[in-house]
Every structure is written in structure tokens, then in C-alpha cells.
């Protein structure tokens, strides 16, 4: 595939949505001024933002089930939750991500397979190896070209999330759950060189500067410039 798949990960309140939007704007501006297109692609630069769950029509329905506290009158069991995320991902890959990458698009995705390992594996306590196998089935082995882990103090992140308004079902989990999720991201980053830690405790401008510096290096490595 000739496009690039860039994922943003992290606990609640890390600013993923803001940073993705800022990066999209910067990439498009940089593309216009520096002609950052591989020589094999004779197209205008396209940068698409998506998210998990919720990147497709099916995904939006699953997102409502997974994250809205009042949709279901019963508790979603941990294994059911895991399988719903996998269903969202399988649809997302085939309906949106693969077609975008095949036509040379840069895809910026808010959460991917590492979220499932961190939240359902470390957070919920489900078998991490089983989750990895399920992720492989859902993705067909597709991995990100680069993952940014927006690392923020858990308490600060939850306070930021709370300031936005109503908590979703994940944000309502207790602090110990979120600390376990953070531990999951720490372990993932230790063992995967494609995961780049970004200090998300800083201002959004400084966070974006860190991201752009890494992306500029990658654009050279990927022969975009």
C-alpha cells in the first residue's frame, strides 16, 4: 500500500483529537509548499482523519453501544466489549483504512490495536495474547506505520476530560482502571519501536511541535520529501 497509516494513542484527556486536527492542517499546508508526495503518486496529497470506534456507519452504531452509559440497561461484559471493538476494527479496516491507503492517502487514526491491549488487556484484565490474536484476525495483520503515544498524567488527563462535559463509559471507570491502562501503554512502548512517546502534559502547541518534528523525519525516511 502506498499511503501511510499514523495512529494516536493514550489515556483519556491526552488531546488526541486536537493534535490529529492540527497535524492534518500542517500536513496539507506542508504538502502545498514542499510538494511532499512520493514520486510514484500522481495525486494531490490527501490526509484523512478517522477514529476507533466509530470510523464507519457500523462503527458509529457500535461506538454508541460501547461508550454511551445510558444506551443499554445491562452491563456490557468484558469479553463482549472486546468482541465489539474487534467488529468495529474489522469493518473499519476493510471499508475505510485499506481503500485510503491503496490510493496513497495519509490516514490519521484516533486509537487502534494498542488501545484494545491497554484498555481491555491491562485495564480489564483480559488475556493480552488472546487480544493480540483477535486483533490480527480483525486487521488481517495491518499495522500502523507510526504510532504516537500521547503520554499524560492520568489525573491531569481525567480532569481535562471532565472539563469537556459528560464522561463516556470508559471515562467513568475508576482511577485504578486508568492507571492500569497507562501501565499498558508503558509496556507497549517498551517493546515496539514504532511507538513514539510524546509528552502530552505540555501545552498543545509544544505537543504539536514534538509531533511535527517526528513527522518531518518520517517524511524524509518515507521519501515524501
From Swiss-Prot:
Query: Top EC class per UniProt?
Result: transferase
- Source gene? tmk
User: Keyword Transferase on this protein?
Assistant: yes
Keywords per UniProt: ATP-binding, Kinase, Nucleotide biosynthesis, Nucleotide-binding, Transferase
**Cross-referenced Pfam families, in alphabetical order?**
Thymidylate_kin (PF02223)
By sequence similarity, the record places it as follows: Belongs to the thymidylate kinase family.
Which GO BP annotation is one of this protein's?
A: dUDP biosynthetic process
Its annotated function is as follows: Phosphorylation of dTMP to form dTDP in both de novo and salvage pathways of dTTP synthesis.
Q: Which residues cross the membrane?
A: none
Q: Does the keyword Kinase apply?
A: yes
Q: What is this protein called?
A: Thymidylate kinase
Which reaction does this chain catalyze? dTMP + ATP = dTDP + ADP
GO molecular function annotations of the record: ATP binding; dTMP kinase activity
Q: Which organism is it from?
A: Trichodesmium erythraeum (strain IMS101)
Which NCBIfam families does the annotation name? DTMP_kinase
PROSITE patterns given in the database record: THYMIDYLATE_KINASE (PS01331)
Identify the EC number(s).
Answer: 2.7.4.9
User: A single GO CC term, please?
Assistant: cytosol
* List of residues binding ATP: 10-17
Amino acid at each position: 500500500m502506498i499511503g501511510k497509516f499514523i495512529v494516536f494513542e493514550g489515556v483519556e484527556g491526552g488531546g488526541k483529537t486536537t493534535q490529529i486536527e492540527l497535524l492534518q492542517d500542517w500536513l496539507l499546508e506542508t504538502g502545498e509548499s514542499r510538494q511532499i508526495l512520493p514520486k510514484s503518486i500522481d495525486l494531490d496529497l490527501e490526509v484523512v482523519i478517522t477514529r476507533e470506534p466509530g470510523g464507519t456507519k457500523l462503527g458509529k452504531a457500535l461506538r454508541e453501544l460501547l461508550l454511551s452509559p445510558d444506551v443499554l440497561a445491562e452491563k456490557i461484559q468484558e469479553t463482549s466489549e472486546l468482541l465489539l471493538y474487534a467488529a468495529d476494527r474489522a469493518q473499519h479496516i476493510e471499508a475505510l483504512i485499506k481503500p485510503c491507503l491503496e490510493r496513497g492517502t495519509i490516514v490519521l487514526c484516533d486509537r487502534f490495536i494498542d488501545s484494545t491491549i491497554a484498555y481491555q488487556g491491562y485495564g480489564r484484565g483480559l488475556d493480552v495474547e488472546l487480544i493480540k490474536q483477535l486483533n490480527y484476525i480483525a486487521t488481517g495483520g495491518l499495522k500502523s506505520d507510526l504510532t504516537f503515544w500521547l503520554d499524560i498524567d492520568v489525573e491531569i488527563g481525567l480532569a481535562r476530560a471532565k472539563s469537556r462535559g459528560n464522561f463516556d463509559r470508559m471515562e467513568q471507570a475508576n482511577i485504578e482502571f486508568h492507571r492500569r491502562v497507562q501501565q499498558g501503554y508503558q509496556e507497549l512502548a517498551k517493546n515496539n519501536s514504532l511507538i513514539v512517546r510524546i509528552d502530552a502534559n505540555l501545552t498543545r502547541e509544544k505537543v504539536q511541535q514534538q509531533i511535527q518534528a517526528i513527522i518531518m523525519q518520517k517524511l524524509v525516511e518515507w521519501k515524501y520529501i
